[in-house]
């Protein structure tokens, strides 16, 4: 039995802050031979046409437009994983509360590790708004690696060589 996971779930919001989490998940999956799944979750309000209000003759975005935009973000993240040398077993698009969707998908797929980025919000903002990564850590059935991008984020990779025993 290996101490390494056989399945990893990368939860991403397609933000700049998530880029280091993408590279880290790709690196871990590659080094451990794990299957890598990628998920992007949009809030349900975005997908039921409750986007920006209609102004003049400009219609509010339709559910199809919003779904297409979310699919485009997910496809871009899959492209980033591939650019980092990783292989994606499957891409998943979720709708709803991101923390709940991530935890449920992790359980459904029986992953051994969830990798998620953190925006590093300040204490007051985090207390008022909550944190998807905090909630996933509290509710996931498996270990969760929260990758926080520093202001001086490294462009060359995740520096996993320094973290893993070889």
What are these regions (language model features)?
Residues 142-150:
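Short, flexible loop segments at boundaries between secondary-structure elements
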Residues 57-72:
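A short acidic, glycine-rich active-site loop
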Residues 21, 48-51, 103-104, 126-128, ...:
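Short, well-ordered secondary-structure micro-motifs
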Residues 2-57, 152, 161-166:
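Small/aliphatic-rich secondary-structure junction motif
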Residues 113-135, 153-157:
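Glycine-rich, Arg-bearing micro-motifs that act as flexible, cationic patches
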Residues 1-4, 17, 79-114, 151-166:
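Structural beta-alpha unit
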Residues 39, 90-94, 145:
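General small-molecule cofactor/ligand-binding pocket signal
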């Amino acid at each position: 039995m290996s101490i390494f996971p056989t399945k990893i779930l990368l939860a991403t919001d397609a933000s700049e802050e998530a880029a280091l989490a993408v590279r880290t998940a790709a690196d871990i999956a590659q080094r451990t031979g794990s299957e890598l799944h990628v998920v992007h979750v949009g809030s349900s309000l975005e997908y039921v046409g409750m986007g920006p209000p209609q102004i003049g003759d400009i219609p509010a975005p339709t559910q199809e437009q919003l779904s297409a935009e979310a699919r485009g973000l997910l496809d871009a993240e899959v492209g980033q994983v591939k650019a980092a040398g990783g292989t994606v077993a499957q891409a998943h698009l979720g709708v709803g509360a991101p923390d709940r969707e991530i935890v449920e998908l992790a359980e459904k797929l029986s992953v051994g590790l969830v990798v998620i980025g953190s925006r590093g919000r300040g204490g007051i903002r985090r207390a008022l708004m909550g944190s998807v990564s905090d909630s996933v850590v509290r509710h996931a059935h498996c270990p969760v690696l929260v990758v926080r991008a520093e202001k001086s984020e490294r462009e060359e990779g995740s520096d996993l060589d320094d973290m893993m025993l070889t």
